[in-house]
């Protein structure tokens, strides 16, 4: 993206997670994945690397989303979206997070342009952990 096309305001991307137990999810994202709690309660804010995760209970509709109700996944084996965490050493992350209690679906697997594996959070959300094997690694996608 060129300098000229940068917006005149800041943008940050955060992942919002609906949880049946906000405190349990907070512990998972901090104690297992290594995030930092910025704010506890409903909602809870966690920073993880250069990103943010917001955890709150479900509910709705509300005045700003009048036809939307937020809930945890009904079937964790059906996903239309998932958190994707890019790392520089997937084997180290896999070992560290496994030791902290993460339950991965499989060990890291080699694919065409990445090594990846998946785990679930306490509410059943799918999380991909991936290491790009292309020259330049994952940072190339941030500054093309």
Which stretches of residues belong to each language-model region?
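Vicinal oxygen chelate
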Residues: 2-14, 36-85, 92-120, 131-144
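Conserved beta-strand-loop-alpha-helix junction that forms the acyl-donor binding cleft
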Residues: 16-22
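Short, solvent-exposed loop/helix junctions and linker helices
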Residues: 19, 84-87
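Conserved active-site tyrosine of GNAT-family acetyltransferases
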Residues: 25-30, 97, 124
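Short Gly/charged-rich anion-binding patches and loops
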Residues: 24-25, 92
